[in-house]
């Protein structure tokens, strides 16, 4: 079972990218579980046809200790297994702590057991590595390979670099490695070249460039992944390609994060800061 975490700055399209990629893997016949690690609890919506899933933390609050696995895991597109950790009530408690509680509960209830015959588990993790809780999949060896969703925008690259610092911090202890950058295009000038160069400097690869296409939003409005909504659309092939590249990937590195000056000079070199 491969344990994958998808990171990236808030609003970059992690949940969309994760679900569309998982749909591609499921279409290839892979058995996948998706663990949403975001208080918004939108990491599995498209795989479940828009169903707003009850989160692990909500279920715990309501049911107490009497929680069964089927209470917190739903079957989605092509038998993907979907669960959302959820978060505390706004303004109370720590969302990172919620992830720790949820993943521990999933382990206790046997969600990762061999009987499920999982090929992959994907963790879709909120925003930047802002606190120890959100770093938990990296820190405790829950995830072994990390992919960072970014774009050619300055803050997305800054966040990607910060996440690399988090991976570097825990690489020796947890055995976690960076599998590559996924460029979720925002149509920034020289975007592909800039992210390829950023990847090279960090010591990794840009595993795929996902072109911007409003069809992704159209599929989302219809509460589906692109592959589910229209398997013949060109954008569906982009996600199939990304799924295949992840499935075949053998490049796993300890990243070399850049100094802020290096990052800024990269932005200047490719014209974004001009």
From Swiss-Prot:
Explain how, and how many, cofactor molecules are bound: Binds 1 [4Fe-4S] cluster per dimer.
Q: Which positions carry ADP-ribosylarginine?
A: 97
* Protein's UniProt keywords contain Kinase: no
State the post-translational modifications: The reversible ADP-ribosylation of Arg-97 inactivates the nitrogenase reductase and regulates nitrogenase activity.
- What keywords tag this UniProt record? 4Fe-4S, ADP-ribosylation, ATP-binding, Iron, Iron-sulfur, Metal-binding, Nitrogen fixation, Nucleotide-binding, Oxidoreductase
Q: Which reaction does it catalyse?
A: N2 + 8 reduced [2Fe-2S]-[ferredoxin] + 16 ATP + 16 H2O = H2 + 8 oxidized [2Fe-2S]-[ferredoxin] + 2 NH4(+) + 16 ADP + 16 phosphate + 6 H(+)
What biological-process terms (Gene Ontology) are attached? nitrogen fixation
List the Pfam families.
Fer4_NifH
Residues involved in ATP binding? 8-15
Please describe what this protein does: The key enzymatic reactions in nitrogen fixation are catalyzed by the nitrogenase complex, which has 2 components: the iron protein and the molybdenum-iron protein.
| Record-given protein name | Nitrogenase iron protein
Organism annotation = Chlorobium limicola (strain DSM 245 / NBRC 103803 / 6330)
Task: Provide the gene name from the record.
Answer: nifH
């Amino acid at each position: 079972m491969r344990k994958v975490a998808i990171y990236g700055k808030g609003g970059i399209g992690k949940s969309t990218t994760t679900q569309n990629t998982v749909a591609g893997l499921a279409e290839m016949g892979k058995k996948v579980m998706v663990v949403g690690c975001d208080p918004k609890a939108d990491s599995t919506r498209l795989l479940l046809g828009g169903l707003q899933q009850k989160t692990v933390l909500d279920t715990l609050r309501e049911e107490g200790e009497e929680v069964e696995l089927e209470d917190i895991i739903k079957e989605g597109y092509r038998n993907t297994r979907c669960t959302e950790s959820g978060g505390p009530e706004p303004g109370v408690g720590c969302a990172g702590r919620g992830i720790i509680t949820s993943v521990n509960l999933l382990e206790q209830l046997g969600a990762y057991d061999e009987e499920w015959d999982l090929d992959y588990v994907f963790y879709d993790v909120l925003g930047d590595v802002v606190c120890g809780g959100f770093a938990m999949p990296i820190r405790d060896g829950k995830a072994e390979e990390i992919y960072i969703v970014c774009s050619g925008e300055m803050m997305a690259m800054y966040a990607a670099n910060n996440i690399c610092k988090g991976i570097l911090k825990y690489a020796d202890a947890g055995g976690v490695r960076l599998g590559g950058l996924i460029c979720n295009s925002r149509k920034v000038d020289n975007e592909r070249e800039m992210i390829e160069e950023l990847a090279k400097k960090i010591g990794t690869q840009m595993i795929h460039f996902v072109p911007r296409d409003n069809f992704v939003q159209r599929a989302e409005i219809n509460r589906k992944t692109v592959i589910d909504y229209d398997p013949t659309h060109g954008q569906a092939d982009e996600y199939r390609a990304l799924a295949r590249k992840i499935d075949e990937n053998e490049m796993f590195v300890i990243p070399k994060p850049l100094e802020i000056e290096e990052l800024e000079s990269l932005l200047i070199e490719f014209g974004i800061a001009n």
